Amino acid sequence: MADTTATLRDRREAVVREHMESENRHDFDATIATFARPRYEIVPTGDVYDGEEAVRAYFAASRAAFPDQRNEVKSIRHADDAVIAEFDLLGTHLGPLRALPPTGRAFRCRMSAHFIFEGDALVCERVYFDQLTIMRQLGLAHETTSLAGRATMLLSHPLTIGRAVARRVRR
């Protein structure tokens, strides 16, 4: 049984490594081929891309925003039904990101992806990361204690800030 488990883990890890390397090469045909059925779940945003057409649209949109997007694998771990990859994602914001115009700024963010398997068939990549890390590096978010952060908060939430100031004055 140990040999079978080791062999299954080896096959799964080879799939994950090819998956991540093909993303770096922007060889999305090869990336799609690593799945039994393509599915990405981007946990911080709540986005789910289910099926080849949806996954290809995700690749197109994310690489339009970050044409040099790539990953650097830091570690790989195994679970009963998954391979978990810890990696840095890097890229430069050179195209539109949803409604946000390009900033020209680069980012690096530590992420974790759970590659879910049924046997040796990859059925889902579920990605976890801190959105704020990326947004700060792109200049799209600020520390709330900084001058830029306070100004942004005041402009974005004038009623909330006004009420907080009024409560403080009444004390």
What are these regions (language model features)?
Residues 2-171:
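C-terminal and inter-domain tail/linker signature
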